[in-house]
Amino acid sequence: MRAILALEDGSVFIGSHFGATGTEVGEACFNTSMTGYQEVLTDPSYSGQIVTMTYPLIGNYGVNPEDGESGKAQVSGFVVAELAKVHSNWRATESLGPWLEKQGVIGIEGVDTRKIAKHLRSAGAMRACLTTELTPEEAVEAARNAPSMEGCNIVDKIGSHPMTPEEVDALVTGKTLPPAEYDIVAFDFGIKYNILRQLRENGFRVTVVPAHTTAEEVLAMNPDGVFLSNGPGDPATLTDIHREVAALIGKVPMFGICLGHQIISHALGAKTFKLKFGHRGANHPVKDLKTGKISITSQNHGFAVDPDTVPDDVEITLINLNDNTVEGIAHRTLPVFSVQYHPEAAPGPRDPQYLFRDFRKMIAASKRQHAR
C-alpha cells in the first residue's frame, strides 16, 4: 500500500506503508540514533511528532517488553528508509511492523530519510501529514492545517500516571536494588521509565505525582528532594506549573531533565525559544563550563533556554558544542540544577549518569545544613 509524507512547504515523499493505516498530522522531526528505535517510539516527549530515523535500516532487532519508555507508542508517525522484515534478537517478542500496527502508528518506508533530514535541517522542523488515504495535494493541505508545536500544551493531552514507590521498584528487573536512602517526589510531565529506573538504582525512593500537583501538596509529603521529568510540547505554555515549581525552589533540593529543565528555567525567571530543527539523537557533545569536560549525550528537545534571559543568580553550567545553546543551569546559592539532555541514556551514551549521584550529594548537603 502506498503511503505519503507531506510537509507544509509542499514537499511530498511517496513510499510504502507499514504499521497502521489512516491519516495523522504532527511536527516532522528527525533522529540520528543508530539504535534505540523502540525507546524513541515509546518516549512521551515525542508525542505530537512524526519522527524520521536517518539510519538506513530500522527494526532489525524487533521489539521486546523491556525497552519501552512508557506503556505504549507515543509518536504520531514513523518514517524509515527500510523496515527490517526479519528481526533477530534473543529478547525480541515480535517484529516492528506488526507491533506498530497494534499500536495504531502509521509508518512509511522506501523514502530517502537523509534527504528529509537535510531538508528539515535547512528549512526547520515543520508541520507534516502522514497518510495512506489522501492524495498528495490533500496531504499538503492537511499538514498546513495542523497545529503548530509552538504554543502547544501537550503535557495535558498525554496525561499523567502517578506511581507509588512500589510500582517504581517493579520497573527495575534483573538487579538487586540498593537501600532507598532519600524520599523524592517526581513530577510526571511524560516521564521515561529509564529515568525512574536510574533514580531508584541511585538510592531514591520515588513517588510519581501528576503534572499539576501543587507546591503545598508536595511539601505535605515532606520529600528530601523534587525531580522534574522530561515531556512534550512548548514549555512556555505551562504557566501554572512554573508558578508551583517557583514556590518549591529554596524549600527542597530540585533536579530537572529536558522539559523539567525548561520549567525550572521559567520558574527562575528565564525564557525559552523554539529551535530551528531541534536536537534529537545520541551523539550531541556538551561542555561543562566549570571543568571543561566534554560529554557525549542523548538529546530530544525542540525548545531551549534563552541565555540572554537567565537571571544573575542563575549560572549557565553546560553548553552544546554544536550550536552553543544552553544545556544546563544551576542556582548560585539554592539547591537547584537542571540539564537539557538525557543522562539516563536510553538510548545513548552513559557519560552523564553522574548527575543522578550529584542529586544525591545535593540532598545530603542540604540535610546536613538543616541539621546544624
UniProtKB/Swiss-Prot annotation:
- The enzyme's first-digit EC class, named in words, is ligase
| Segments for region (CPSase) | 1-179
Q: Where is the active site?
A: C258, H342, E344
Keywords (alphabetical) are: Amino-acid biosynthesis, Arginine biosynthesis, ATP-binding, Glutamine amidotransferase, Ligase, Nucleotide-binding, Pyrimidine biosynthesis
* Cited SUPFAM superfamilies: Carbamoyl phosphate synthetase, small subunit N-terminal domain (SSF52021), Class I glutamine amidotransferase-like (SSF52317)
- Pfam families to which the protein is assigned, alphabetical: CPSase_sm_chain, GATase
Which GO molecular function entries does the Swiss-Prot or TrEMBL record give? Answer: ATP binding; carbamoyl-phosphate synthase (glutamine-hydrolyzing) activity; glutaminase activity
- Its EC number(s): 6.3.5.5
Please give the pathway this protein is involved in: Amino-acid biosynthesis; L-arginine biosynthesis; carbamoyl phosphate from bicarbonate: step 1/1; Pyrimidine metabolism; UMP biosynthesis via de novo pathway; (S)-dihydroorotate from bicarbonate: step 1/3
Q: What does this protein do?
A: Small subunit of the glutamine-dependent carbamoyl phosphate synthetase (CPSase). CPSase catalyzes the formation of carbamoyl phosphate from the ammonia moiety of glutamine, carbonate, and phosphate donated by ATP, constituting the first step of 2 biosynthetic pathways, one leading to arginine and/or urea and the other to pyrimidine nucleotides. The small subunit (glutamine amidotransferase) binds and cleaves glutamine to supply the large subunit with the substrate ammonia.
The UniProt similarity line reads: Belongs to the CarA family.
This protein's name: Carbamoyl phosphate synthase small chain
Tell me the organism: Akkermansia muciniphila (strain ATCC BAA-835 / DSM 22959 / JCM 33894 / BCRC 81048 / CCUG 64013 / CIP 107961 / Muc)
Source species taxonomy: Bacteria, Pseudomonadati, Verrucomicrobiota, Verrucomicrobiia, Verrucomicrobiales
Q: Which gene encodes it?
A: carA
